[in-house]
Regions:
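Hydrophobic, small-residue-rich alpha-helical packing segments that form membrane-like cores
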Residues: 179, 183-189, 202-293, 298-311
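TPR repeat positional signature
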Residues: 1-2, 6, 38-41, 45, ...
């Protein structure tokens, strides 16, 4: 009865109640329950770990999962625990450990993990995958479902490792993984993880401009969601990828921001802190779209407070960088700054972008140009900001420089021409 009550509480997103009921159920099992009640122990152990994770008891959740892994009789019985373990490690900032966990599972499932992936190889993979999509995508494919459970598991873990590879390895390694996931779906039919895989790929391909119809493919991926029972944690991933990385090329920033907030709330209500990726994109979009700074500062502080409550490091650095920018624009940080500082930042691109953005609005044109140039040099490795936005502000800043300087203007003129060309492309893609 305690287990059923705990499951019902989990279904209703009442994680603390679930934690209490499931803990009571575990305490009532006999000492030899892994031998005498194996299936029950396996299920109850995993549910308890999930409830502990949702209640921010990460150490306890990890301990429970490792106990389940040690007592599980097969790899397939271990798979749910490995996935949840990788999510817990990722939330705590242990990206390498999370990556290694997913890598280990994929190797056990017969997949190969590359040490590195060259840019040219990644480009070819994307082109081949998009070509396969064009050849396969039709009503017949839409009617097919991926029946092989092992294959569905592989697609799921490829989706999990993609973002981890982006953070801890390289963009090109991440592209390799997500191309494999999408190709498996195209060859064997769609599954519940296919929409997110397609959107992850479109997010990378959109930045490389491999095809003009990528937005249409992304919309098709969204429509696939209606065929499957998708959980709140996956909804937050879908919304983050579509509205945070793709849709804002074509749809108003405000629409994207509103839907990203929905993605954040969906993740939070499901007990998953992966929704904080949506929060990062909410703030990024709000800064660029010109929301009121005072309101924006309060929203950032709200997310930072929740991160502290959830004991999570997910997107903390990115939110702190954004907060420094908003604080500097309000009063140069004199009354609005906080003690928390950015640390161990693995990607320099957001730092350079915010330095350039602050300099632009503060009137420091040379400094602004310096940091936008650094952003451009890194854009092939890390792209967290819309390239059109980078070029827009870089172009405006260069125009301001050209008004003041009459010598050494060749580079600034190139930037302006590039920005105008990019804005024409953006206007052609957008209907608003």
């Amino acid at each position: 009865m305690n287990m059923k009550a705990g499951e019902k509480a989990l279904d209703g997103c009442d994680h603390k109640t679930a934690y209490s009921y499931l803990g009571a159920a575990l305490s009532l099992l006999p000492n030899d329950h892994w031998k005498s009640h194996y299936d029950l122990s396996l299920r109850l152990n995993f549910l308890m770990a999930g409830a502990a994770n949702s209640c921010c008891q990460y150490d306890e959740a990890e301990q429970i999962l490792r106990r389940g892994l040690a007592n599980a009789r097969s790899l397939y019985d271990q798979l749910p625990s490995y996935l949840l373990l990788s999510q817990i490690l990722r939330a705590q900032g242990n990206v390498d450990d999370a990556y290694n966990t997913c890598s280990f599972v994929l190797l056990q499932l017969g997949e190969t993990i590359p040490e590195s992936v060259a840019p040219e190889a990644a480009k070819t993979l994307v082109e081949d995958t998009l070509k396969m999509y064009e050849e396969v995508y039709d009503d017949d494919w839409l009617e097919r479902k991926m029946e092989d459970e092992t294959m569905r598991t592989v697609v799921k873990f490829y989706g999990a490792i993609t973002f981890l590879a982006f953070l801890s390895r390289s963009r090109y390694t991440a592209i390799c993984f997500i191309c494999k996931a999408v190709q498996l779906s195209l060859q064997n039919g769609a599954c519940v993880y296919t929409p997110l895989s397609l959107l992850q790929l479109m997010g990378f391909a959109m930045e490389d401009k491999h095809a003009a119809n990528l937005y249409h493919i992304a919309k098709n991926a969204l429509s696939l969601l209606e065929r499957f029972d998708v959980g709140g944690d996956q909804i937050s991933g879908v919304f983050m990828n579509f509205y945070g990385r793709i849709a804002w090329h074509y749809e108003p920033f405000q629409v994207c921001g509103d839907n990203l907030r929905r993605g954040f709330e969906s993740g939070l209500s499901s007990g998953s802190n992966l929704g904080f990726h949506c929060a990062f994109h909410v703030i990024k979009t709000a800064i660029i779209s010109g929301e009121k700074l005072d309101s924006l500062l309060k929203e950032i502080d709200y997310y930072l407070h929740l991160l502290k409550t959830y004991k999570s490091e997910l997107m903390k650095n990115a939110l702190l960088i954004s907060r420094e920018t908003v604080s500097a624009l309000i009063d140069k940080g004199e009354a609005t700054s906080i003690e928390a500082k950015v640390f161990n930042n693995s990607s320099q691109e957001p730092v350079f972008f915010h330095q350039a953005y602050r300099a632009f609005w503060s009137g420091y044109t040379v400094r602004c140009h310096h940091y936008f140039e650094k952003c451009s040099q890194l854009s092939g490795q890390y792209v967290q900001f819309n390239p059109f936005v980078l070029k827009f502000y870089h172009g405006l800043n260069s125009l301001d420089v050209l008004k003041k300087k009459k010598s050494h203007t060749t580079r600034y003129k190139e930037v302006v021409r590039d920005a105008i060309s990019a804005m024409k492309d953006a206007a052609a893609n957008s209907e608003w």
